[in-house]
């Protein structure tokens, strides 16, 4: 193979469309742009989003102030009143709550909320805590740890 023998693959290149070179050439007269109107004239045509004077879609639709997250983080939620029945110094995790049948489903990482009261000290390990849950666990001489 020599440098002058290199050629593109057959069918990989396409000839450029030559317009305005006579009616018999196939693209003569109006050059494939139709009869009259803005799109047949020289220049850029209309801007993106222009709908011919009709109120465009992006102006018809209201501006949304807030929209929900696409993938919100799902937690398995438990309140402190459910943990009040556990014995003192128990280590509370998602697995231990499922095993003790305090929780029936696993919807994701464990989050402890502060509804209710606890009187026994517990060692709670969870992915998230509400501020009131942290205060109540600490007030009952327990410990909390975010994992």
Curated annotation (Swiss-Prot):
A Pfam family of this chain: Ribosomal_L27A
Region (Disordered): 1-55
Feature: compositional bias, Gly residues: 23-35
InterPro entries referenced in this protein's UniProt entry, alphabetically: Ribosomal_uL15, Ribosomal_uL15/eL18, Ribosomal_uL15/eL18_sf, Ribosomal_uL15_bac-type
UniProt entry keywords in alphabetical sequence: Ribonucleoprotein, Ribosomal protein, RNA-binding, rRNA-binding
UniProt GO cellular component terms: cytosolic large ribosomal subunit
Family (UniProt): Belongs to the universal ribosomal protein uL15 family.
Name of the protein in its database record: Large ribosomal subunit protein uL15
Organism: Microcystis aeruginosa (strain NIES-843 / IAM M-2473)
Gene designation: rplO
């Amino acid at each position: 193979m020599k440098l002058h023998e290199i050629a593109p693959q057959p069918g990989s290149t396409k000839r450029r469309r030559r317009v305005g070179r006579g009616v018999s050439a196939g693209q003569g007269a109006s050059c494939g742009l139709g009869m009259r109107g803005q799109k047949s004239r020289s220049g850029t045509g209309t801007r993106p989003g222009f709908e011919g004077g009709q109120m465009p879609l992006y102006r018809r639709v209201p501006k949304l102030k807030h929209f929900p997250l696409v993938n919100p983080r799902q937690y398995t939620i438990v309140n402190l009143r459910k943990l009040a029945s556990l014995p003192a110094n128990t280590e509370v995790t998602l697995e231990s709550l499922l095993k003790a049948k305090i929780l029936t489903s696993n919807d994701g990482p464990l989050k402890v909320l502060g509804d209710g009261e606890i009187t026994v000290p517990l060692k709670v390990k969870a992915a998230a805590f509400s501020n009131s849950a942290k205060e109540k666990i600490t007030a009952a001489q327990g410990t909390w740890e975010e994992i």
